[in-house]
Amino acid sequence: MLDFNLAEILFENRPNKYWKMLRQIGVKNAVGVLPRSFSDWRKHDEETPWNYLSLVKYKNMINDSGFILDAIEDNPPMERVQFNLEGKEEDIENIAKMIENFGKLGIKTWCYNWMAGIGWFRSFTHLNTEFGKVSGFNINDIKNAENYHIKTDRKSLWENLKYFLDNIIPVAEKNNVNLAMHPDDPPIDNFTGIPRIMNSIESYDKLLALNTSPYNGITLCQGNFTLMTENLPDVIKHFNKRIFFVHFRDVIGNKNNFMETLLGHGKTDMHKCMEAYNDINFKGIMRVDHVPTLASDDAYVPGYSYLDRLYSIGYINGLRDSVNS
């Protein structure tokens, strides 16, 4: 029987009406971000969101709003580690401190990524007659983009990732915190002159082989993984217990040219995916991810509209009930 934690990401630094709506429809679990905003007029906390005092206030705010904080999905500064720059030891120290504080606070999962330079990217957000306001990517839109100001190569990125894992996995093991690597988004080979290395099924096999700890795992973002494979349910079964966190979303197109869609309107058989999660007895965290913006929605973050996220939560619950029946 499927018994995962259906969570929702809370971007806001204060409770708002959407948080109330989530509780009204039965969502109890939350995914948070690092608390980068000031907590009060003294402006103490912004530069150190990985510190215990910043995190405990943030967790208490989420708990007081009726949610359980299951995961943090956010990278602290780690560019010096990714590019092997002077000062990388300080970044490692801060990340280790963050993981220790997650353990103290009962935050069981950290979703991070290895997108060196620029993180996830969309090249358009526009109105679409079928889905409303949609976001997507076309590789032709970036062909004249300036290269990132730091240079590296694929081999170095893998070596730097191994250094990171060798230093952080022991801290995660000691503090019972799962590390869940998010794929490159989009999963193309190169972005602004920087190679992407977490962009295929084979790259995830290599990630898990770099450090075989059971705490070294995956954020299976379906919108990215479905651009890497024609059989996402088989990939779910392949990675099995190393999947700690799922982003349940879909797209149409391919990795070089895609658009994000309503659930049920994309390229993936979502019911078969849910059956695959049942087959592996998935007990982790699942959340809605990038969605279109429907008419009259006042959400301000492209891909994270309120109305379609509520629709998607209902869709996931319906699929889960169908599989469980």
Positions of PLM-derived features:
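Structural motif corresponding to the early beta-alpha repeats
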Residues: V33-K162, D166, E173-K174, N224
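Histidine-acidic metal/acid-base catalytic patches
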Residues: M1-N5, E12-R14, W19-M21, G26, ...
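Basic, amphipathic N-terminal segments that precede the first structured/catalytic domain
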Residues: M21-S39
